[in-house]
């Protein structure tokens, strides 16, 4: 289910020719990557970490997804993709340098699958309850299908190729992100 949701999420990335730099040339802006895509991506990526990286699900799966999402929602419109790349890179470097932080320290977190609070890669969990994994997987799949259906509907209504053209141009987030773009980019849009 995770793989299907992930593939659908790739097709939810619209407006590939609408990636701009900000006026001060410090940010990469992708105005068409609005809250619709961000929500679908966050749900899918949390599902991935929750299901496959149990000790990472809190830090990498939730905290790292919320940081760029909050930034995009409140002060960095259009900059979500760059913020996501930065936070992910910082986490990966930290996790490689201090791997025991997430695995064996007092800050380690295990998902409900490991109900007995024990994780050993050589021993399957005896009290495993994968119910939440299935619930999260279905939620992520449904969200990505809904966003993709919305993209198809908008593309047909606007008679646009959603991958070459931006299709969320009527959304407030898109307009605010484009205001941050360099003058040349705004004329092209």
Please report, for each region that a protein language model flagged, where it lies by residue.
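Generic multipass alpha-helical transmembrane bundles of integral membrane proteins
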Residues: 1-78
